[in-house]
């Protein structure tokens, strides 16, 4: 199974300390060698880094470990491939836009025999079950709420 790291803060914070240990799990202290990615939410934007190389040996992961990017929300993923080749397009987290907002998705697990109808505006670029599930979720939301994001409940 994959490894996930998330951070949610009330003030912008860097993830350098936590990411240092997490990065090592991608081929050094654990066997998750099939790519990695991390997404930092910054205002309405998302800064995302992806690499199909093991995170423990990735110069990009080293940069992320050493560069204090401050964010309120961070999602990181280290991949152990179960479906889809080790390629950039199969590396999590995945990003799409819906209702003028970026959505990020990372998944741990294997969705055997998951084959939803591929219709709608969200189509996978790679060939993982995770990206297919993400596209299906977004298609379902867009169909259910065609006028835009629902208002939060009071």
Predicted features by range, described:
Residues 2, 103-113:
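Conserved beta-strand-loop-short alpha-helix elements that form
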Residues 52-64, 78-100, 117-120:
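Short acidic (Asp/Glu) patches
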Residues 38, 109, 133:
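Residue-level signal for inorganic ion chemistry
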């Amino acid at each position: 199974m994959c490894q996930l790291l998330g951070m949610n803060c009330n003030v912008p914070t860097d993830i350098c300390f936590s990411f240092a240990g997490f990065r090592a799990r991608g081929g050094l202290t654990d066997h998750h060698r099939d790519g990695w990615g991390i997404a930092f939410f910054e205002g309405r934007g998302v800064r995302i880094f992806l690499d199909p190389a093991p995170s423990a040996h990735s110069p990009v992961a080293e940069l992320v470990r050493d560069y204090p990017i401050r964010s309120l929300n961070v999602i990181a993923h280290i991949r152990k491939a179960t479906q889809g080749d080790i390629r950039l397009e199969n590396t999590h987290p995945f990003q799409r836009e819906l209702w003028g907002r970026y959505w990020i998705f990372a998944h741990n697990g294997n969705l055997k025999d998951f084959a939803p109808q591929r219709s709608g505006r969200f189509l996978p670029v790679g060939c993982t079950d995770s990206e297919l599930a993400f596209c299906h979720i977004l298609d379902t939301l867009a169909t259910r709420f065609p006028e835009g994001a629902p208002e939060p409940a009071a």
